[in-house]
Amino acid sequence: PVYRGKGARLQRALINFFLDEARKSGYEEIMPPTVVNEASGYGTGQLPDKEGQMYHCNLDDFYLIPTAEVPVTNIYRDVILDEKDLPVKNCAYTQCFRREAGSYGKDVRGLNRLHEFSKVELVRIDKPEHSEQSHQEMLAHVEGLLQKLELPYRILRLCGGDMSFTSSICYDFEVYSEAQKRWLEVSSVSNFDTYQANRLKCRYRHTEDKKTELCHTLNGSALALPRIVAAIMENNQTPEGIRMPKCLVPYCGFEMLDDKPC
């Protein structure tokens, strides 16, 4: 999509709001590349399983990232972290690229599924015994964003058949689309246990006995922008225009999304 005027400012406001909220929760911001090598995609599990959904630059054998999870998690490839430095908490805003091969029909038009979209991602690395607590904290963070945006939402715990094989547990957050009369996913928050860490050889060293152990990795969208923009527009319509959530007004500089000049 092309955003113009107040629409462009709304997009930028959401990005800054999501990053600021992540920083307040202790996440360090990363600005990663959007082009990665095959080893990076393999390390986080996108390759070879999802190769058909990724854009491949054949000439140089690089891939466009489907999510910031790929470059950010790969920062810790072949790294041994000190126990005292855990948990690692990173966030990143990037453009994401997905082929959406095999997706056809009215349900994938508009902002439902895009080949390129903006997203803020959370990545955490923690000790095995603390990863469930980290997962719960990430879930609470994403839920807090949706509450501040004043959007109708629901949380789904995915069954094994709906999860990626890389995840040990995953929750989806969905917002309601009034126009489509259905729920749309805006975030998935996953605990990968040792799956990615084993591929990446991401370990930590115990303080007492100096032995090393595989970390647990987690990630979640906080949040994906296109569907959030659509949800704000659908759920906040008034005769004067589209009302902005209070949390966004300081970021975008206006209370109503309308055709008046910025």
Predicted feature residues:
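TRNA-recognition modules of translation machinery and tRNA-sensing kinases, especially anticodon-binding
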Residues: 1-262
